[in-house]
Structure formats: C-alpha cells, structure tokens
C-alpha cells in the first residue's frame, strides 16, 4: 500500500473528526478503493503508528483502534476488532467478578466463626458442660460449651456459651430452649452480646476449673486426637477402668479457652502407665481414636519444648514442663 494511500486515509479520518464532533458514533465510511474502520472519541488523540499496519490511537480516557484495510479484507477486519474488544471486556468483567467473589468469601469466612455461638443464661448452678452439651445436642452439632465460674468461689455464675455447628442449628437451639426448663430453672438463650473482657473471663474460669481437680505425677500419658468437647472429667472417666489413675486434664488455648485437642493423664506408677498405653491406645472416645504416648517431665526446662513430628498439628506445642518421649505405644 502506497504512502499516498495512507495519507489519504488519515485525511479522511481527520475530516470525519472535524465534521462529526462529540455526537459521532463508530461507523463504516465507504470509498471507491478502500474502506476505513475506526472508533471515534471527541477527546484529543495521538497518532502512534502508520498505515498499512493498524493505527493505534490513545486518548486521555480510553484506548481506541483505527484500522485501514482493503475492500476485500474489510469484513474480516471488523469481525476481528469486535471479537478482540468483546474478549477484552469479558476478561475485565470476569476479573471484577472474581475480586468480588474473593472479598465476599473472606467476609463470609470471618463472620462464620461466631455465627453459631449462643448465650445461655439462668442455668442451674450444678449443671456441667457435658450435661449442657447433651441437651443442646438435640438441636444439632455442638462445637463447644463454656460455663462461667466465679473467680473467688469457683462456683458457677449460672450462665455460659454454647457454640453450634451452624447458624441454622443455633437458631433451632434458640427456638427449642429459650424459656424452657432446665434443672428447674427457666433458661434464656439468645445470640450473645459479650462485654469487653468477657471472653477472657470465660477462658480463665474454664482453665481454672480444668486444673482444679488435676493430681500431677511424674508418671503421665500424653493423649492426642481428643474430641473438641471432651472435658478433663470426661478424659478421666475414659481411663476409669485403668489401675492407678490419679487425674486428667485437657489443654486449652490461653486466648480463646477452646480445647487444643490433647491432654494428660497421671498415674501412680510407671507400671500403670505402660498398662494404659497397651490397653487404651487407639480406643475411640467420643468418636475419635486416642493417640497415646509416654510423657515425661523436665526438671529444669531451659529451652522451648521440641517440635512434634510432621502431621501432629494439634499437638504442635506442649506446656513448658511437659514433653513427649520417643517411646512409641
């Protein structure tokens, strides 16, 4: 294609620009020997390429493409332009939708952690977490139960929190048990409005209650893969048929008061420990198979407890004075 032809095409473009002003729409302009396809914007633009290659023009708003083509190639060029633009816009729309989906997923994930949490008030002072879990189990899956105890007297304050597996189950539990009778008292069940510091109080009372009846001993068994609702008393009861059991404790998160999925059982002698390892390892407690190991006590811990083997994520760290031995059960 000659330079004179290109100059003529550009001149036609300039003439169309001057005559059509801001109301001009993209169209096909026919000539005797060629056809000019272009998109027009009323803003100023800059020529950055010359015919016969596509003319790429840039404005201060959006990029526009001008094409010069022979008469026999006009239809295919127009199709390619339209397909290219549609593909670009489709990719942009998909990108925006993807970002919105990711953001929505993040918000849903952040909100879902507390959706099933319920406040339960006016409880009988003698009710235990295990008993409350069994009651609310009629409404669905119970993830966690926390009863609040007085700091000084270690007596139940008559309220607590129950976390259900989903928001639907929480609503079902609220409908079933709000204003119902439990142990001769009319309980109140609703979604909690916990005052500042309330969660820390729940955590402290739960851990204090957990350690209150534990009898320590140098002869201990480490128990992993515990059910999330298993209490220290429940763990001790599971070993009730074993000789020489002194106590049991489940380890909880310091910040949240939730079970970490492992604990310890203390015994009177090393023989009792070996007997429990041989008998109870792999036994199911609340639907989960116990993973037992011999635990030993450090007299003067000077370093952090060693990391456990790969895959033991819930047992990633122990209390500072307790470690796992290399003895396999």
Curated annotation (Swiss-Prot):
Q: Where is the composition biased (Acidic residues)?
A: 77-104
Q: Where is the RRM domain?
A: 116-194, 219-297
Q: Name one GO molecular function term.
A: RNA binding
Fetch the SMART domains from UniProt: RRM
Look up the domain of life of the source.
Eukaryota
Q: What are the record keywords, sorted? A: Chloroplast, mRNA processing, Plastid, Repeat, Ribonucleoprotein, RNA-binding, Transit peptide
Matches recorded under InterPro entries: Euk_RNA-bind_prot, Nucleotide-bd_a/b_plait_sf, RBD_domain_sf, RRM2_NsCP33-like, RRM_dom
One Pfam family named in its UniProt record: RRM_1
The entry's localization annotation reads: Plastid, Chloroplast
Identify the main location. plastid
Question: What cellular-component terms does GO give this entry?
Answer: chloroplast; chloroplast stroma; cytosol; ribonucleoprotein complex; thylakoid
Q: Where is the transit peptide?
A: 1-69
Q: Where is this region: Disordered?
A: 77-117, 296-329
Tell me if RNA-binding is a UniProt keyword of this record.
Answer: yes
Would you kindly state one Gene Ontology biological process term found in this protein's UniProt entry?
Answer: mRNA processing
Q: List the disulfide bonds.
A: none
Q: Which SUPFAM superfamilies match?
A: RNA-binding domain, RBD
PANTHER family on file = OS02G0815200 PROTEIN (PTHR48025), RNA-BINDING PROTEIN CP33, CHLOROPLASTIC (PTHR48025:SF11)
- What is the role of this chain? Could be involved in splicing and/or processing of chloroplast RNAs.
Q: What is this protein called?
A: RNA-binding protein CP33, chloroplastic
């Amino acid at each position: 294609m000659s330079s004179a032809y290109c100059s003529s095409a550009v001149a036609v473009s300039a003439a169309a620009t001057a005559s059509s002003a801001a109301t001009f729409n993209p169209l096909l302009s026919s000539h005797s020997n060629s056809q000019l396809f272009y998109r027009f914007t009323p803003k100023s633009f800059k020529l950055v390429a010359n015919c016969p290659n596509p003319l790429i023009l840039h404005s201060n708003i959006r990029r526009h493409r001008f094409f010069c083509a022979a008469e026999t190639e006009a239809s295919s060029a127009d199709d390619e332009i339209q397909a290219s633009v549609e593909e670009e816009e489709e990719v942009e729309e998909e990108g925006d939708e993807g970002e919105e989906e990711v953001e929505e997923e993040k918000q849903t994930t952040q909100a879902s952690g507390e959706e099933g949490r319920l406040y339960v008030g006016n409880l009988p002072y003698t009710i235990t977490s295990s008993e409350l879990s069994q009651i609310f189990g009629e409404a669905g899956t119970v993830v966690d139960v926390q009863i609040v105890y007085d700091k000084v007297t270690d007596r139940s304050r008559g309220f607590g929190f129950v976390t259900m597996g989903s928001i639907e189950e929480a609503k079902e539990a609220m409908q079933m048990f709000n204003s119902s009778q439990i142990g001769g008292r009319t309980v109140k069940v609703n979604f909690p409005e916990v005052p500042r510091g309330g969660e820390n109080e729940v955590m402290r009372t739960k851990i204090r209650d957990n350690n209150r009846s534990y009898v320590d001993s140098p002869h201990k068994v480490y128990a992993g893969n515990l059910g999330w609702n298993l209490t220290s008393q429940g763990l001790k009861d599971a070993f009730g048929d074993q000789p020489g059991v002194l106590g049991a404790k489940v380890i909880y998160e310091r910040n949240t008061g939730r079970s970490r999925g492992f604990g310890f059982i203390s015994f009177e002698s090393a023989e009792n420990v070996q007997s429990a390892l041989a008998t109870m390892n792999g036994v199911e407690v609340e639907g989960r198979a116990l993973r037992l190991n011999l635990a030993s006590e450090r007299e003067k811990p000077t370093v952090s407890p060693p990391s456990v083997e790969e895959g033991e994520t819930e047992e990633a760290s122990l209390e500072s004075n307790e470690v796992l031995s290399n003895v396999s059960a």
